[in-house]
């Protein structure tokens, strides 16, 4: 079998040959990571020897291999391949395996005839060789597309990973299941080489590990086609493509989970559901349209609710964790980015009825009482929070399963409570356990919050979420609130009905101007005393660009009252500085004065769309130029090329509708 390509790798961590087989496993079990035209694969039965039970997926593997041997035994035969296949049944235990896998293509209008294809994969452990034997529609071997990947030791820590094909000249490519030879050499081989020497384990499970990938792919494409017009009529300010296709993917996942549940438990009636914190309600709309009775509840009504029609039941109401918000007749509770309700989903489900199950997709980090406080720096904040929500489910008596969804989001791990760990007769005892656990979490929140607020050595907070790894302190006024009858936790605060604007845009104008000027002086001058010394040379030919400081260094020079005001805004100091992009440049948490001599549209790496590159004529010269007024060297641009007014005589009236909180004309 001729060699097509080879890549040399250095095994500095001594992970080979184990790392090679780990990389092969990724290509075997998750080919969509590399081949984006695939939805995934299903790995069928694995044999250590070909014997009596050699049939799987309607394919008799032993018979198929015998037929392949016969076909390959003619003139021009490949002795090495014949030896590999014929000797397979005689190999020693643990020396290799044979696996049947099915490659599942995505539905693609450019490749409408492409169907799932099977292939037999032979792993030869002693020789570090993996062989792929593809099958056609009639389950006959496509000998032209047989290929091997081999690992070989060169010398010292140097190894080679090579690609071999049986007949590269006659290779048949459909662009999906069978990629082109050039792709195999350039993409597949290089990735396998990279993965082979990586000593990195994922914190999360494989994507779609709890559902059949082929079934998911078919249903997702059907639903995507069915609800794609929602993108065209989306009335919300959010990105329609992201939200529509994300909800279609979540609905697909739930529908398959529920279908599998009905099949396993021999149920005929489709499961009912309630989506707590349903947001735009699209998930509720899709699930209802697909025949599942249910409703969505959210504290704030959305514009799009009116478009769904009467069959989609959506309610505007705040949800409180108490005895009045139980759902005894509901099969499933859903928490899709449900924020402060996320940890309460398992509790509400467990207390609604013994048969109630739940699905939760955590996003923002909340505990029972407020913002979640990190307890360990050994894990990422996301992983730690997932473990917390999983622990809540387990303490509530659920067998909690974890899976990764295939959605356009960085927060795509879901937790599912599908069954209980205890019999119904133990409900009273388990509920007492739940109560104790919730109280213990309440105490932990107060303890961590108090410790954080008393720690005088902590640097000042930079934004509304983080404080040296901690999150917002618990409001002490909530601690003293009285427990209402039937309430499970005093002081729980649902989200506000009117979504507050916290992007620093509504802060007092004087406060913004003062903070901007203070930060600018900090960057432009070496000290803030009366005799300020410019950072750069005082020569008139040099425009003072100042220095670069980190956000933390800037925050250390600001007054505590200023930081507290910024702490209540999303993004805090960073958002304020980015809002004033005429003055500042913020990249990777480093702040500097923007130099408009260099930052011109022609110098930017990525050109923005034409509509965003040009400034509307009705806003030109409607505000004073900050640099003209405040910079020691004035504005680096001449008045004609600056969109802001150089002096009051250049100011033009603005025709843009005024805000509720009007600002003065000084540009920041």
From Swiss-Prot:
GO BP, one annotated term: tRNA methylation
Renumbered residue ranges of the record's region Disordered: 441-460
Zinc finger (C3H1-type): 620-649
Spans through the membrane: none
One GO cellular component, as annotated: cytoplasm
Highest taxon of source: Eukaryota
Catalytic activity, reaction form: uridine(44) in tRNA(Ser) + S-adenosyl-L-methionine = 2'-O-methyluridine(44) in tRNA(Ser) + S-adenosyl-L-homocysteine + H(+)
Keyword hit for Iron-sulfur: no
Primary localization class, coarse: cytoplasm
Keywords: Cytoplasm, Metal-binding, Methyltransferase, S-adenosyl-L-methionine, Transferase, tRNA processing, Zinc, Zinc-finger
Record family assignment: Belongs to the TRM44 family.
Protein name, per record: Probable tRNA (uracil-O(2)-)-methyltransferase
Species this chain originates from: Xenopus laevis (African clawed frog)
Gene that produces this protein: trmt44
């Amino acid at each position: 079998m001729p060699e097509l390509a080879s890549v040399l790798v250095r095994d500095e961590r001594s992970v080979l040959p184990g790392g090679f087989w780990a990389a092969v496993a990724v290509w075997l079990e998750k080919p969509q990571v590399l081949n984006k035209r695939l939805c995934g694969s299903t790995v069928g039965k694995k044999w250590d020897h070909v014997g009596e039970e050699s049939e799987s997926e309607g394919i008799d593997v032993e018979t198929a291999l015998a037929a392949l041997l016969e076909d390959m035994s003619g003139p021009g035969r490949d002795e090495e391949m014949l030896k590999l296949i014929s000797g397979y049944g005689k190999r020693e235990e643990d020396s290799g395996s044979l696996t049947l896998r099915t490659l599942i293509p995505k539905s693609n209008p450019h490749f409408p005839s492409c169907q799932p294809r099977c292939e037999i994969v032979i792993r030869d452990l002693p020789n570090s060789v993996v062989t792929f034997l593809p099958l056609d529609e009639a389950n006959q071997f496509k000998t032209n597309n047989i290929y091997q990947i081999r690992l070989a030791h060169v010398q010292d820590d140097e190894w080679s990973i090579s690609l071999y094909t049986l007949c590269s000249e006659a290779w048949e490519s459909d662009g999906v299941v069978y990629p082109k030879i050039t792709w195999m050499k350039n993409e597949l081989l290089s990735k396998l080489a990279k993965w082979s020497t990586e000593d990195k384990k994922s914190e999360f499970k494989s994507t779609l590990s709890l559902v059949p990938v082929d079934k998911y792919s078919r249903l997702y494409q059907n639903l995507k086609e069915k609800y794609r017009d929602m993108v065209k009529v989306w009335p919300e300010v959010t990105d329609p493509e992201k939200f529509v296709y994300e909800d279609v993917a979540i609905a697909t996942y739930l529908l398959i989970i529920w279908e599998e549940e009905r099949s396993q438990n021999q149920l005929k009636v489709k499961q009912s559901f309630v989506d707590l914190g349903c947001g735009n309600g699209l998930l509720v709309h899709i699930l209802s349209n697909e025949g599942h009775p249910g409703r969505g509840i959210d504290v704030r009504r959305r514009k799009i609710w009116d478009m769904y029609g009467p069959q989609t039941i959506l309610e505007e109401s705040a949800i409180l964790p108490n005895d009045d918000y139980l759902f005894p007749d509901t099969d499933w509770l859903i928490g899709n980015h449900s924020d402060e309700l996320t940890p309460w989903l398992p509790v509400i489900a467990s207390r609604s009825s013994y048969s109630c199950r739940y699905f939760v997709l955590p996003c923002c980090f909340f505990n029972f009482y407020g913002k979640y406080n990190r307890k360990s720096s050994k894990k990422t904040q996301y992983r730690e929070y997932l473990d917390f929500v999983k622990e809540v489910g387990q303490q509530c008596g659920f067998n909690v399963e974890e899976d990764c969804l295939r959605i356009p989001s960085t927060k795509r791990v879901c937790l599912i409570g599908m069954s209980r760990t205890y019999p119904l007769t133990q409900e009273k005892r388990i509920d007492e356990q739940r109560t104790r656990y919730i109280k213990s979490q309440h105490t932990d929140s107060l303890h961590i919050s108090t410790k954080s607020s008393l720690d005088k050595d902590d640097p000042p907070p930079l934004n509304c979420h983080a404080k040296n790894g901690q999150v917002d302190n618990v409001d002490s006024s909530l601690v003293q609130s009285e427990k209402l009858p039937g309430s499970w936790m005093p002081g729980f605060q649902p989200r506000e009905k009117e979504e507050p604007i916290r992007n620093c845009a509504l802060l007092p104008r004087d406060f913004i101007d003062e903070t901007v000027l203070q930060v600018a002086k900090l960057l432009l001058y070496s000290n803030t005393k009366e005799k300020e010394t410019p950072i750069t040379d005082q020569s008139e030919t040099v425009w003072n660009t100042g220095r670069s400081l980190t956000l933390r260094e800037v925050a250390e020079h600001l007054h505590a009252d200023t930081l507290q005001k910024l702490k209540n805004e999303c993004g805090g100091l960073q958002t304020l500085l980015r809002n004033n992009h005429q003055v500042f440049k913020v990249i990777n948490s480093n702040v500097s004065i923007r130099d408009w001599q260099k930052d011109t549209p022609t110098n930017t790496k990525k050109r923005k769309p034409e509509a965003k590159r040009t400034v509307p004529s009705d806003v030109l010269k409607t505000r004073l130029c900050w640099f003209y007024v405040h910079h020691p060297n004035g504005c680096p641009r001449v008045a004609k090329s600056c969109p802001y007014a150089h002096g009051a005589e250049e100011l033009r009236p603005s025709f843009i509708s005024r805000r509720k909180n009007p600002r003065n004309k000084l540009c920041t």
